[in-house]
Structure formats: C-alpha cells, structure tokens
C-alpha cells in the first residue's frame, strides 16, 4: 500500500506563514502526497509550488463553520478553481441539518458541486456535532447531490475523525464514494486503521511523521 497517496498534507491554521506553506509544499514534493490542503488565499502559491508534480491542490469552502450562504460557497469554489484548485473540501450547513431542513443541506452541496465542474468535491459533515442518524443523513445528501467524497471533520470543532464514524460513513455511501478521515491520524498505525475502516483519503498535518513511523504532535 502506498500510504502517501492516501494523505492530504494539510495546513489550515489561520496564522500560517508563507515559509510554513513553502515547507508544506516541499514535503509534498518529496513524499508525493495525494494533495496539499491549504486555505484559499494560498491556492495560487501552492499551484505554482507544485508545478511538475502529480500532487493536487485542495482548498476549503464555507470553512470552518459551513454557515455562509450557498451563493457565497459557489463563488468561493469558482474562484478557488480559477486560482488553480484541483479539489474542494466544503462544509455542510450543519445548523440546517440539525434543524431538519434536508432540502437546504442538499441544495447547498449541489451548488458547490455544480460550481466545481469536473473538480473533486469532498463534503465535510462535521461528525463530532452530529448524531449517528444525522451522520447517515448527511452522507446520503452528499451522495445525492453528486459529491465525490464525504469527510469527517474540519479540525476546528470539538473532535476529529473516529474509526466508528469512518466505518459508519463507508457503510452508508457504499464502495464507490470516497471517505476522508480528518483530524484523527497521528501515527502510521492510526492511518492504517482508518484505511481498514474504509477511508480512501486521510487529512492530516502529520503526513511526514506518519510515513516515518513517528508519533505526531497536534490533533489534526
């Protein structure tokens, strides 16, 4: 198994400096991760820094709360793609889901999917805030709206990925949709366990440490 190709090498901290982004890009080039995941302001810089590699540029939309309007999320998506983004990680409208407004949740996801064209869309359900029933509903709505992946977490709420959540999400969406575990893998063993549970992508700031077999600091 080429575990590096499961990893979205991530730096989403609001105080990230250019030199830290450059370090992220350098590590991505060296280790050949699936993607780097950065905030929208860094997309253009990341695209240039990864020229000549097969590492994708992933960015976030409606992040981290998911509480912007669908129009804003669609605009963010289009601009990110214009700037070079290959993949979009969007946050659902969590409040709408918990209020039972499933039509709004679905249309919100669909707005981003339609704005993304042929680019990959991952839907962050923020599992730590949801009941198991709500997790299932969120995954079903993401699938119905045409997204490519469901993703556990933003890394900015009360918890990250759990094995139980990844397993539930995989059982819900079946074998043909991606599942991204974010915020729970701190070691090589953690990463393998998530993959065995059904994850096809792992979002982490600790990709290098994981591949080296070291225990990473931090919780994303």
From Swiss-Prot:
Main location, first listed in the record: cytoplasm
InterPro entries: Aldolase_TIM, DeoC, DeoC/FbaB/LacD_aldolase, DeoC_typeI
Enzyme's top EC category: lyase
Active site per the UniProt annotation: 89, 151, 180
E.C. no: 4.1.2.4
Localization in the cell: Cytoplasm
CDD domains reported for this sequence: DeoC (cd00959)
Recorded catalytic activity of this chain's protein: 2-deoxy-D-ribose 5-phosphate = D-glyceraldehyde 3-phosphate + acetaldehyde
Cystines in this chain: none
Gene Ontology molecular function terms on file: deoxyribose-phosphate aldolase activity
Pfam families: DeoC
Pathway: Carbohydrate degradation; 2-deoxy-D-ribose 1-phosphate degradation; D-glyceraldehyde 3-phosphate and acetaldehyde from 2-deoxy-alpha-D-ribose 1-phosphate: step 2/2
Keyword Iron included in the entry's annotation: no
GO biological process: 2-deoxyribose 1-phosphate catabolic process; carbohydrate catabolic process; deoxyribonucleotide catabolic process
Cellular component GO terms, alphabetical: cytoplasm
Keywords in alphabetical order: Cytoplasm, Lyase, Schiff base
HAMAP family: DeoC_type1 (MF_00114)
Protein family according to the UniProt entry: Belongs to the DeoC/FbaB aldolase family. DeoC type 1 subfamily.
Protein task: Catalyzes a reversible aldol reaction between acetaldehyde and D-glyceraldehyde 3-phosphate to generate 2-deoxy-D-ribose 5-phosphate.
Name this protein carries in UniProt: Deoxyribose-phosphate aldolase
Lineage: Bacteria, Bacillati, Bacillota, Bacilli, Lactobacillales
């Amino acid at each position: 198994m080429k575990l590096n190709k499961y990893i979205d090498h991530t730096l989403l901290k609001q105080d990230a400096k250019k030199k830290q982004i450059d370090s992220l890009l350098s590590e991505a080039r060296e280790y050949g991760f699936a993607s780097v995941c950065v905030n929208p302001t860094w997309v253009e810089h990341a695209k240039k820094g990864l020229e000549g590699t097969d590492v994708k540029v992933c960015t976030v939309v409606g992040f981290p709360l998911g509480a912007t309007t669908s129009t804003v999320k669609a605009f963010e998506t289009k601009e990110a793609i214009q700037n070079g983004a290959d993949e979009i990680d969007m946050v659902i409208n969590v409040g709408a889901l918990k209020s039972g407004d499933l039509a709004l949740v679905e249309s919100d996801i669909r707005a981003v999917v339609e704005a993304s064209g042929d680019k990959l869309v991952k839907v962050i359900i923020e599992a730590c805030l949801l009941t198991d029933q709500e997790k299932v509903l969120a995954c079903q709505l993401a699938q119905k709206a045409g997204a490519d992946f469901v993703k556990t977490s933003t890394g900015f709420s009360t918890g990250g990925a759990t094995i139980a959540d990844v397993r539930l999400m995989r059982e819900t969406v079946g074998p043909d949709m991606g599942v991204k575990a974010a915020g729970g893998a701190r070691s090589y063993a953690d990463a393998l366990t998530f993959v065995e549970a059904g994850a096809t992508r792992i979002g982490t700031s600790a990709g290098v440490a994981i591949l080296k077999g070291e225990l990473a600091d931090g919780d994303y």
